[in-house]
Amino acid sequence: MNKKQLKIVTGVAIAVLIISIIPMLWISQYLHPFADDYVFGAEVYKIWNETHSFPACVQTAWNVAMTMYHTWQGTYSACFLMALQPGVFGQYWLGTFILIFSLVTSTYTLLYMVMRKLLHSSRLEYLFVSTLFVLMTIQFTWSYYDAFYWYNGAMYYTLFYSMSLFLASLLIGYQLSSSKFKKALIGGASIVLSIIIAGGNFVSGLGMGAILFAAILIMKMEQRKWPRLYITILTIYGIAFLFSVLAPGNAFRQVTIESKPNVVVAFFMAIGKSFEFLSESINIAQILMLMLLSPTLVKAASSSRFKFSHPWLCILITVTLYSSFFFAHSYAMGTRGPGRVQNIYSYLHLW
């Protein structure tokens, strides 16, 4: 496509994206809390109605998170946010706005860092690719209800996935920054965000840890030195993630599972289930949209400074990293997980 055609197609894509999101937001006014929304939000709801003090609600939400840590699940930051769900303040519809906004902005942000900062694509090319990518991410979501409308389940996966994209954007920004002040600011924000993500779901938790580890090894091979910030973040992330995994509540919860595969079986099961999911999720609409994107992506890749002397190794690493997101549920339950979990897989497979 020439520049004029690309401009027209990009404009149409942006219009379609906006039009497609409007009804998704509109129906949020009819939502109400459901299931675990009540379990996690009851105490905060009580405090809010008694005091109308937001700081008191924050303290109560943390108390709920710590109670859950010792009795049911160790995902401390997720439980904290679950307890603070908008429904306790009478604004349950706000959850849909937060979830869609976070998914859209995080995807645009990471693609901006990749296309504009790393690949040096034009602004128009970036808008074209990122808009279609966001459109596919939203419209090809595995379970819409679990992704945008049930706060407890959606926040646990969609929001933490979005946080992971923001963290990736920050880490790229750190590498590209030459200002010590900016590096310190980005580094601090990255550490805080990594601690929050580590206290979220185990699907994103394991996958993000694997990506960080792979990034460190690749940067060591390319730059001939260890990336100190990345190692620091992975270390802090690992400690925080272990704090979540080793929670007493997880042991109580695991007792409810009658049987599960061992680590080795779960590893190969995760790889198998990743291919199984891809075979079920990729459809003709996605293929056509990827074909539409391919000329722009090929142009960006061919003009970049990045070289892939071992493409098969690159594919192997990519498949392994993608499969790492399937490991948590394969090991814990021997399945791909419910719809809210599979939303993560549907977001990721586009990358």
Where are these regions (language model features)?
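Transmembrane-helix motifs of polytopic, lipid-linked glycan transferases
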Residues: 100-124, 166
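Membrane-interface micro-motifs in multi-pass membrane enzymes
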Residues: 125-175, 201, 323-351
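Individual alpha-helical transmembrane segments in multi-pass integral membrane proteins
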Residues: 66, 90-106, 133, 137, ...
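Hydrophobic cores of alpha-helical transmembrane segments in multi-pass inner/ER membrane proteins
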Residues: 102-108, 161-173, 207-215, 284-296, ...
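Membrane-interfacial segments
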Residues: 114-122, 175-179, 222, 305, ...
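Start-transfer (signal-anchor) and selected internal transmembrane alpha helices
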Residues: 1-22
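Transmembrane catalytic cores of multi-pass membrane glycosyltransferases
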Residues: 27-89, 93-96, 151, 198, ...
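Short hydrophobic alpha-helices at membrane interfaces in multi-pass membrane enzymes
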Residues: 173-195, 231
